[in-house]
Design a protein with these regions (language model features):
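Catalytic alpha/beta core of large soluble enzyme barrels
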Residues: 1-11, 19-22, 73, 82-271, ...
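Nucleotide/phosphate-binding sheet-loop regions of phosphoryl- and nucleotidyl-transfer enzymes
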Residues: 25-30
Length: 289
């Protein structure tokens, strides 16, 4: 059904023809950092996705998808489902997830009134913005952000090879595993085993993670389409999106969270602040319907 939605009022007609021809799908996975999916055969999963696509396209009369499988960032989806985001690891065993709301939003009004213990004034915009801090516990045995960059890259390679490419039918480029690689410049690799056999045998002494990742990316350039690479930062700042906490702090905070009843939140008026939406800066959206 998704591939059949090709009537784009805001794009040139050529794009409708392109989307009808390729009928692309984006069947993604998220929560991979919990480790459960790693037990299963991704090639079989991709095969089943192709079979279902073939069955449905025969019934709907559209083209079969040129590319079916992907791994998206899944930031919002992971919050709704309570999972790790896309291919990425969990932040830690226990942490706070901080969300920001305009104080005039109905959900913010409800939380500030009924659950003030979850709310803090934003230190940068205390007059109009509230931070809501939610305690999170990663499932037992989950992959955590403390893993090495090579561990993350090898997981990207595994999904790219067995899930993405297995779901590719035609086209010059495959879909991608969306991933941000955090590199710790203080982490050293001392032997070939440490860096999954990537250290040049002619180099002497340890390599830092930037060097090892650069070498991995070159030698495995067929295993990804694009990657974001950022320095790992183990510090914190006030009201960061993710902040480590202890198990004791988690247990203290989760009691309040269990008492939430969001069915009491009703939106009477449109309180969207278009000034905080990039595409609608200045109060006028770029895309008009």
């Amino acid at each position: 059904l998704q591939a059949g939605f090709t009537d784009f009022h805001y794009l040139r007609p050529i794009w409708a023809k392109t989307t009808q021809k390729d009928a692309l799908l984006g069947i993604g996975m998220t929560g991979i950092g919990s480790g459960e999916i790693l037990k299963y055969d991704l090639e079989i999963a991709a095969y089943m996705a192709k079979q279902v696509n073939q069955l449905i396209t025969e019934k709907t009369g559209i083209n079969e998808a040129a590319r079916i499988t992907c791994v998206k960032p899944s930031g919002t989806t992971s919050l709704v489902l309570g999972t790790a985001s896309g291919i990425h690891a969990w932040h830690n065993d226990y942490y706070l997830r901080t969300m920001r709301f305009n104080k005039n939003e109905d959900i913010a009004v409800y939380l500030m009134k009924n659950h003030p213990e979850l709310c803090e004034d934003d230190v940068l915009r205390p007059t109009d913005t509230v931070c809501v801090r939610i305690p999170v516990k990663a499932p037992e045995g989950s992959i955590l952000r403390t893993e090495t960059a090579i561990d993350t890259l090898e997981r990207v390679k595994h999904f790219s090879t067995n899930w993405i490419k297995s779901g590719h039918i035609n086209g010059d480029n495959t879909h991608n595993v969306s991933a941000t690689i955090s590199i710790d410049a203080n982490r050293k690799y001392y032997d070939r085993h440490d860096s999954t056999s990537l250290i040049n045998e002619f180099l002497e002494g340890p390599m830092n993670e930037w060097e090892v990742v650069g070498q991995w990316m070159w030698e495995n350039r067929e295993s990804y389409n694009g990657l974001s690479v950022l320095p790992y930062w183990g510090g914190t700042y006030q009201q960061a999106p993710f902040e480590d906490i202890t198990e004791e702090e988690y247990n203290k905070r989760i009691v309040t969270l269990k008492e939430l009843d969001l069915t009491n939140v009703t939106e009477q008026d449109d309180t969207v602040d278009f000034g905080q939406v990039a595409a609608c800066a200045g109060g006028a959206c770029e895309i008009q319907f």
